């Protein structure tokens, strides 16, 4: 069969760029410098349209991370009209908190400084992340301490306008350990650089729940009820704190879902995520 078909162009071309250096940081006992990188998916066409940006922050217990994880899923957001960025951050093997949130905020500032190049609407930024990345998503939304902004592009704001954390640790002072020795070796203590059982107040003050104010951006929190790694109550506590402060917040409790289960990658849930970002980021 021979057929002539006329196709109207209604969608832009989507460009994926990997390993963009957004910052250089000290490494190996401050004797060297290394690049921090991000991956980006953005639309490219002949118009001057700008698109909201969603920053993805992967998990890994703060001890390992791979910014390329889930890029195939993240492309779904790009096709819904968002610029999507997956950001590398330093792990607790390289340094303690707040190093990790400093990296995330540096990436946000870099993207805003290069908004024209990547077709970004710099006034409409969201963040989404899983587990350890969910913690950093919360802190990107809630921690406005100017001391967290270090490095380049300090003329740009690192603030975001919407947050979607998945199964996030939100109160590092309430994780349960059988004894101080187990606590000292925990991912939470390694992140903070001290034994949490012996520094409860400090751990609380380094947690998202301690940073909630009435000025928090909208939140969509997603957590599996059967999570055996980060208890569901962690998200409930953050949600309750947001509501107490009059903030815009929703909590989706996934029935039967454990930590990072396949339920988090089903179309039904992603439709809710896309709807959230479209409404909150315009």
Question: Where are each of the predicted segments found?
Answer:
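Alpha/beta-hydrolase superfamily serine-hydrolase fold, recognizing
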Residues: 1-282
């Amino acid at each position: 069969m021979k057929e002539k078909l006329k196709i109207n162009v209604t969608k832009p071309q989507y460009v994926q760029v990997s390993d963009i250096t957004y910052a250089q940081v000290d490494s190996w006992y401050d004797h060297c410098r290394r690049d921090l990188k991000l991956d980006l998916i953005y639309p490219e066409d002949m118009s001057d349209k700008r698109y909201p940006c969603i920053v993805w922050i992967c998990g890994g217990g703060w001890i390992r991370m791979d910014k390329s994880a889930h890029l195939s899923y993240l492309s779904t957001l790009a096709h819904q009209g968002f610029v999507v960025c997956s950001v590398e951050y330093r792990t607790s093997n390289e340094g303690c908190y707040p190093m990790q949130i400093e990296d995330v905020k540096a990436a946000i500032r870099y993207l805003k400084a290069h908004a024209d190049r990547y077709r970004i609407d710099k006034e409409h930024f969201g963040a989404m992340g899983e587990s350890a990345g969910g913690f950093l998503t919360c802190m990107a939304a809630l921690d406005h301490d100017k001391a967290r902004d270090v490095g380049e592009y300090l003329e740009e704001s690192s603030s975001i306008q919407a947050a979607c954390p998945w199964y996030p640790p939100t109160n590092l002072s309430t994780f349960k350990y059988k004894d101080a020795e187990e606590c000292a070796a925990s991912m939470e203590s390694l992140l903070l650089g001290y034994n949490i059982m012996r520094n409860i107040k400090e751990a609380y003050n380094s947690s998202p729940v301690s940073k909630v104010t009435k000025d928090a951006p909208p939140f969509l929190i997603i957590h599996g009820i059967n999570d055996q790694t980060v208890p569901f109550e962690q998200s409930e506590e953050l949600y309750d704190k947001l509501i107490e402060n009059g903030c815009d917040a929703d909590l989706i409790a996934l029935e039967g879902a454990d930590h990072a289960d396949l339920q988090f990658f089903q179309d039904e849930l992603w439709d809710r995520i896309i709807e959230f970002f479209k409404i909150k980021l315009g």
